[in-house]
């Protein structure tokens, strides 16, 4: 069994999920449990450029990734980028590139200014994956 790492942007992760190249239906993954407040704090961390913990996948012979860790984060990111929830009212403000404080509470992804959308979609996610892992 070998471990590799890749860096995907949030946009790449969502595209891979959309085309079925990432699977979250396995015994080690719990069901989706994060509420919008927790999801909003993750998006806030991305807007600020804070480090997000790495995700862990296995990869099968067809190149499909099976998630070992990262289901909540992956789904929160893609749900937000697909306008499936708005940032909650307790989401802290964010600084723009000029040092101005911006309040995005109650906003969906498509309502954000372009610079904020870019920070999210271009956010780099570290993914470790294992080839040759058996059940």
PLM regions and their residue ranges:
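A short, surface-exposed helix-loop junction/capping segment
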Residues: 19-27
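Basic- and aromatic-enriched surface patches that contact anionic nucleotides/nucleic acids
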Residues: 1-12, 26-36, 40-135
């Amino acid at each position: 069994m070998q471990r590799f790492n890749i860096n995907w942007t949030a946009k790449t992760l969502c595209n891979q999920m959309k085309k079925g190249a990432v699977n979250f239906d396995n015994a080690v993954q719990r069901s989706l449990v994060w509420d919008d407040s927790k999801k909003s704090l993750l998006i806030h961390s991305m807007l600020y450029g804070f480090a997000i913990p790495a995700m862990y996948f296995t990869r099968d012979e067809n190149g499909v990734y099976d998630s070992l860790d990262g289901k909540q984060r992956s789904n929160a990111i893609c749900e937000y980028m697909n306008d499936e929830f708005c940032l909650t009212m307790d989401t802290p403000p964010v600084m723009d590139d000029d040092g101005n404080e911006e309040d995005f509470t109650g906003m969906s992804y498509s309502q954000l200014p372009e610079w904020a959308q870019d920070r999210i979609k271009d956010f780099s996610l570290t993914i470790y994956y294992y080839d040759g892992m058996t059940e």
